[in-house]
Amino acid sequence: MSNKKNILTVAPFLAEDFVEASEIVFDVDQYQQFIRENKQRLGLFGKYLICKFHDSWVIDTNINDNLFSITLNDFSTHVFADAIIEKKNLNVNHDKLVFPIQLDFKTNTKVTFNEVDDYGNLTEIEPLKLDEYLNEQVVSIDNDKIEFAFTFWKTFQDDKPGQKFVLLLIATEIIISERQDLAWQKIFGSDFDNYYHYFKQHFDSDRYVSDQHKCLELIDEYDTTKSSTNA
C-alpha cells in the first residue's frame, strides 16, 4: 500500500490547481467558518487568508531548522497603487510599486517542498527558490501549533515551463511584519492617504478588493462619497 501523501486529503482547498475538479470534495463555506472561529489564534495573518496574497511575488526567503521566513510584495496593495496611478494620471515608475510584508513561521519540524502529479500525489523535493505566492490552506489548529499548506509558483530558465509546488509546514508561532504603510508613504507621500486608508478599511473587512477592477471601483466609490459629503 502506498504511503504517499495526496493533495486531496492533505490540502483539498489547494487541489484544483493539480487535479480534476470533479475529484475534489471540500466545503468552502465550512472552511471560511473555521477561519472565522479561529481568528484570534491566527492573529494578524488571519486577515490575509483565503487568496488575499494571491499573485504576490516573493522578494526573499530564509529557511533554517526552526524558521521559515518569506517576504512578499503584497499584491493587493500593489494593485491598489496601480489603480491610484491610473485614476489620478500619476507619473510613477511601476518598478517602484513594492509593498513588503514579512511572514515568519517559527517551527520545530521540517518544512517540506513537494511536487504534485496529475493524480494529486505529493513527492518531496529539495528546497528551491520560490517566485510567486498563489494560495494557502490552514489544515489544522490546536493550542500548540498551526498546520499550513501553501502553493507557490516557480519560473524556470531555458524555456522550461513554470511549475506549481506545495510547501507544508507546522508553525508554533507566526510573526507578521507589515511594511506596506512605510512603502506607500515613500512612493506617494501623504497626498493619497485618504484613499489608502479607505482601501485598507475595506481590505480588512470581508470585502474582496484585491484586483484592478475592484480597486478602480473603490476609488470611484470614495470620490463619490467625498463629493456627497462636501455638497
Report residues per predicted region:
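Surface-exposed, interaction-prone regions used to assemble/regulate multi-protein complexes
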Residues: 2-231
